Design a protein with these regions (language model features):
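Active-site His/acidic residue clusters
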Residues: 138-152, 169-210, 214
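Structural recognition of the beta-strand scaffold that forms the well-ordered cores
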Residues: 34-38, 65-68, 82-84, 120, ...
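Substrate-binding rim/cap in mid-to-C-terminal beta-strand-loop elements of soluble/periplasmic
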Residues: 84, 246-288, 299
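Metal-dependent active-site segment of extracytoplasmic phospho-/sulfohydrolases and closely related
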Residues: 35-36, 54, 204-248, 281
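Bacterial Sec-dependent signal peptides at the C-terminal "C-region" and cleavage site
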Residues: 8-30
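Active-site nucleophile/metal-coordination loop of metallo-enzymes that catalyze phosphate/sulfate
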Residues: 25-31, 43-123
Length: 302
């Protein structure tokens, strides 16, 4: 009889061990919303003399580096793409500002596009609101618009410099996006027209600083600021009136990140390259990174 009881107990233990346990809850997002603001042509060389009171205040509110490196070549297409697709140009094939890659990318999605952070988010959560508001129309070539619920290019941004603020704030207040990328082109215009270190470039900096401030005010008015992370970044600097080479003035750019769960008044001392931005956004939403990505999460979280 004792042997029978022992055998029954063994069977019960075995059956219980084979039963699936309670599913583990998915970890909560670090923040519910990410707003990326890209300042085209904002080089680190301009920071010391630049009049940017709001940006400097946000550096105290979050984490920052003045030494983020571009991918090469130091042009807009390759670098905005790297921030979204997590890869360098030799992998993505995006070595210029053309709509199509110059050579076949190593990895393509079902959209025949690079796997961007927009794609990762939509794969995991199809209902998540995603959007882009940009002043440079070619920016949309690298975002995978099939993964966007909203995209708007500002027409004649030089003639209507406040339109980027108005459109961005309206979208944020109306839709409260989970992931949004806003592109501001004014500094690049000044760099090309008047050159690195020009009075005209420096005069534009406080105007751009104020546009960033007003967009952030819009995030607050939308009621999502306390559950948001805001990332301020740039694609390249300038050398003279151009870029595309490998001078430090072209390849060093600032990065500022602040908001929910971000370390305050923290200077990032680790190496940061453009494609690390994609990995950091993926970490915020606990998205699985593709094997093709080369970016690593920037250590800015509390």
């Amino acid at each position: 009889m004792k042997r029978i009881l022992i055998a029954l107990v063994a069977v019960l233990v075995s059956v219980c061990a084979c039963q699936p346990g309670p599913e583990k809850a998915a970890p909560a997002d670090i923040a519910g919303h990410v707003i990326v603001i890209g300042l085209d042509g904002w080089g680190t060389w301009s920071f010391e003399k630049g009049d940017t009171p709001f940006i400097r205040e946000m550096m105290k509110e979050g984490s920052y580096t003045l030494y983020k490196r571009t991918v090469l070549p130091s042009i807009s297409g390759a670098n905005w793409a790297a921030m979204m697709n997590g890869t360098p140009a030799e992998s993505s094939g995006i070595i210029g500002n053309n709509a199509a890659p110059y050579f076949k990318p190593l990895v393509l999605t079902e959209h025949n596009a690079q796997p961007t952070f927009f794609h990762l988010l939509k794969q995991a959560r199809p209902e998540a609101e995603t959007g882009v508001v940009c002043e440079w129309g070619d920016f949309l070539n690298y975002a995978d618009t099939l993964c966007l619920d909203y995209f708007q290019r500002i027409q004649d941004p030089e003639g209507h410099p406040d339109a980027i603020v108005e459109e961005s704030v309206k979208y944020i207040k109306d839709k409260k996006p989970v992931l949004c990328f806003i592109h501001i082109d004014a500094l690049d215009h000044m760099g090309h027209a008047y050159g690195q270190g020009s009075a005209e470039y420096y005069a534009e900096l406080p105007l751009v600083d104020d546009r960033v401030r007003r967009i952030v005010e819009g995030v607050k008015e939308a009621g999502i600021y306390d559950d948001s992370i805001i990332i301020l970044t740039s694609d390249h600097g300038h050398e003279g009136t151009g870029h595309g080479g490998h001078a430090l003035n072209e390849i060093e750019t600032p990065l500022v990140i602040w908001g929910k769960g971000i370390r305050k008044n923290h200077e990032i001392t680790e190496t940061v390259i453009q494609y690390d931005l994609a990995a950091t956004v993926a970490e915020i939403f606990h998205l699985d990174k593709p094997q093709s990505w080369r970016g690593v999460c920037i250590p800015v979280f509390e």
